[in-house]
Design a protein with these regions (language model features):
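Polytopic transmembrane helical bundles with strong interfacial aromatic enrichment
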Residues: 1-199
Length: 199
């Protein structure tokens, strides 16, 4: 299945280039990539559990934690799609208006650019709430993953704001997207780990 998804996403990537950054195709390409990350993350944690059977402690997956993780995963996917849309629109506007400054390019975007920032800080508060839930009752791999999620979201917000106010290299955008994609996979791993620990 993973091999099929990789091939399909590669083919869709070629279509993205030939379509001159069609926003719908770019978003579809990103959705497929995130689905691939989720599948690979699930396969990774399943393999890890088989090899390290004794590494998991008896931890109950509470309803609060379950709902928080599912909500966090959904919000991150939406956040990535919003960011992809913003980046695509900026590049399309820059092609049509090559003399626009960075500020003018940002001003040309719709109001959903603010939604991207608001959602980012919502993710930060939600991840902080998860850290609070894991503070006393959770140990080992699960707690490490929760703190990694919180730290990565903080770094992503910092990097996103730096990209707005400073002329950072183009590779920064790539790392910004990669970091968010890692979060999608880490949440899948964490949720699956807790499900296992509950059983």
């Amino acid at each position: 299945m993973s091999l099929f998804l990789v091939g399909a996403n590669g083919g869709l990537g070629a279509i993205v280039v030939s379509s001159v950054l069609n926003p719908f195709i770019v978003s579809l390409h990103m959705i497929l990539a995130l689905f691939l990350v989720s599948v690979l993350s699930y396969a990774t944690i399943e393999s890890y559990k088989l090899i390290n059977f004794d590494s998991f402690t008896s931890i109950l997956l509470s309803k609060k934690v379950s709902i928080s993780l599912i909500t966090l995963w959904i919000f991150i996917v939406i956040e990535i799609l919003l960011g992809t849309g913003i980046r695509t629109n900026i590049e399309l506007i820059a092609i049509d208006n090559p003399l626009f400054s960075k500020g003018e390019l940002l001003d040309s975007l719709n109001s959903y650019k603010y939604l991207h920032s608001i959602l980012g800080f919502s993710l930060l508060f939600l991840s902080f709430y998860l850290c609070y839930l894991f503070k006393d009752d959770f140990l080992g791999l699960s707690k490490q993953l929760v703190y990694f999620i919180f730290g990565m979201i903080m770094f992503q917000i910092f990097l996103g704001e730096m990209m707005i106010f400073f002329e950072l290299p183009q590779l920064t955008r790539l790392f910004h997207t990669w970091g968010s994609s890692w979060l999608v996979g880490i949440i899948i791993i964490l949720y699956n780990t807790l499900q296992y620990e509950q059983s």
